[in-house]
């Protein structure tokens, strides 16, 4: 660190991203990427003609992508905001709905960036322990009077709450935003997008990194009431209006529209997860009932240090 670094940043422990080795080929599992190539429609959309347009700024309104997303999710375009990866959507949400007087509540075992962002933005963290079986007890979130973020399915456990449980948390916190991070929802979770028109305090965040094979393109979506999305756009247009590049806009639109490829690759990953779980259990591992594209397993035969 230099002597010029601000006290705020010097006190923050940054997030450590998953290693991206470049030296040789690995069976790479550390960041839960898709084993499948992007949709052929995505490859066609990122054409030479589009590459030539990189001299021009991207559309800050993301109009074509928003129309495709609205049609796919059954929402209006003003209920959706694209982000440079769902991390940006989540960061914008914390910037919009939390501050030094308004804490963020989240589980003790969950996505590590929540705590990093709280440190960066001077947001107090209300960390709520999971139960001994790694499940989240919705009653722990009743009447908190705080912004809440829940990864559902959770990472790294892969466990998911039913939509009805999230709805109960929304009803118990009507005056605070409840953020549902659905990065892994397409592998067996129950999305809360159908609740958006009933709860103006619900913000759902999804990513194209896992089930749509676009981790390297960096694209996420925040979905909620038009008023919540307007709040997020207030942050976006104060920070980075051109947050989605031209090629990612085209790739994201094509990925949403190619539902057959999405369904086929998603089903294949779920089948592989089931087979792998059976194989691990046959070898004496305890494996949680994952609704994600990864498994949380343990064994008494060796400890982690070995």
Show where each model-derived region lies:
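N-terminal "arm"/small-domain region of PLP-dependent enzymes with the aminotransferase-like
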Residues: 1-56, 144
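Phosphate-binding glycine-rich loop
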Residues: 63-103, 121
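Glycine/small-residue-rich loop that forms an oxyanion/phosphate-binding "nest" at active or ligand-binding sites
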Residues: 77, 85-98, 154, 162, ...
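Hydrophobic/aromatic residues located in beta-strands of well-ordered beta-sheets
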Residues: 80, 104, 178, 202-204
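Active-site phosphate-binding strand-loop segment of PLP-dependent enzymes
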Residues: 126, 130-186
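PLP-dependent aminotransferase class I/II
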Residues: 201-281, 285-288
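Conserved PLP-binding catalytic core of the aspartate aminotransferase-like
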Residues: 270, 282-306
